[in-house]
Regions:
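Short, surface-exposed amphipathic charged segments that create phosphate/polyanion-binding patches used
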Residues: 94-100, 146-150, 167-174, 201, ...
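Class I S-adenosyl-L-methionine
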Residues: 3-6, 11-130, 134
Length: 280
């Protein structure tokens, strides 16, 4: 484990009048959002907070930082280690450090978008550890705006999981159908871990696998989805981001990009339909 000494212990918070005041703290846990994956979108507050921590970890299983950004993060904030699922879900070592030193857990996107990190925040509070949050731009914010659909017309967000052997989880698809029945759009995040264990190197789900999972889920529930048009959003928030709107077959045949998500539209008004069709 890398122990880093910082000469600065300065942090800023809002005073009673809404202005910034400088505070000092020698210990605690910082949940720091890095933004969508292009560190150019990382806030100055996030960089400053991470620099001021003595221990820095990059959470590596709920989201994925592109390989070319790893060295850049090191340049921005200093040395860090990657933490996978066991260290986050069993955070005793993390908490022991946070009781006596400043500890940063850096997360791609916004740190409180995943329930994993909300749970960590609550457990830290129960353990008497002060927990600070530096928010970042989330995939939810980027995608809903970029595709041109109204954010208030989205239903529950789902994550499409890899099949595990013979087992295929249909609950994500059931939520998509529930949203459609309510005339709501669905943001579908794609699984990063074929093992489901959160310990190995991540392997983002491809568009072809995602479409296959949708079709198998539909077959299992005897629902016909072959007339669906969906949006594929790739590498969002990065210079190479791409949006494509088309049929299931068209989406499945796209090989470009590295990290993807889907938007499955519900009922669209005229403006939303026009906005979405520009991505065909």
């Amino acid at each position: 484990m890398t122990h880093l000494t910082r000469k600065s212990e300065k942090h800023y918070s809002l005073d009673d009048d809404g202005g910034l005041e400088m505070t000092k703290t020698n210990s605690g846990l910082w949940l720091i959002g890095l933004g969508p994956g292009d560190l150019s979108a990382m806030s100055l507050a996030a960089i400053d907070a991470a620099k001021d921590c003595e221990y820095r970890y990059l959470e590596g299983y709920t989201a994925l930082l592109p390989e070319n950004e790893m060295s850049r993060l090191n340049e921005f904030v200093g040395d860090f280690e990657v933490s996978m699922r066991p260290a986050i879900e069993n955070p005793e070592q993390l908490f022991e450090l946070a009781k006596k030193a400043r500890v940063a857990l850096m997360v791609v996107g916004d740190p409180l978008q995943a329930t994993t990190h909300v749970d960590l925040q609550l457990r830290a509070s129960e353990a008497g550890i002060e927990c600070h949050v530096i928010h970042g731009i989330s995939i939810t914010t980027i995608v809903t705006g970029a595709v041109g659909l109204q954010s208030y017309r989205f239903g529950r967000q789902v994550t499409l999981a890899y099949p595990y052997g013979e087992y295929l989880a249909t609950s994500p698809f059931e939520l998509i159908i529930e949203n459609k029945e309510r005339k709501l759009h669905t943001l579908v995040l794609l699984d990063l871990d074929p093992t489901g264990m959160g310990v190995d190197e991540q392997k983002p789900m491809t568009p072809a696998i995602a479409v296959d999972v949708l079709r198998k889920s539909a077959d299992k529930l005897s629902i016909n989805i072959e007339d669906w048009n969906i949006a594929l959003c790739s590498d969002m928030g990065r210079p190479e981001q791409r949006i494509f709107y088309g049929t299931l077959d068209e989406v499945a045949n796209i090989n470009d990009g590295s990290i993807h998500c889907l938007v499955i539209p519900g009922r669209m008004d005229e403006l939303e339909l026009k906005a979405l069709q520009r991505w065909k």
